[in-house]
């Protein structure tokens, strides 16, 4: 469970970072 959650987080993180830096 933790591993899949980290995978999802790692996949979403770049989008969040780019949205914050917008």
Swiss-Prot record:
Key words of the record: Amidation, Amphibian defense peptide, Secreted
Protein name: Melittin-like peptide
Superkingdom per UniProt: Eukaryota
Modified residue annotations for Glutamine amide: 22
Tissue expression as described in the entry: Expressed by the skin dorsal glands.
Compartment(s) where it occurs, according to its Swiss-Prot or TrEMBL record: Secreted
MF (Gene Ontology): protein kinase inhibitor activity
InterPro entries associated with the record: Melittin/Api_allergen
GO CC annotation, single: extracellular region
Originating organism: Rana temporaria
GO BP annotations, alphabetical order: defense response
């Amino acid at each position: 469970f933790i591993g899949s959650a980290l995978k999802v987080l790692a996949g979403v993180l770049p989008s969040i970072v780019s949205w914050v830096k917008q």
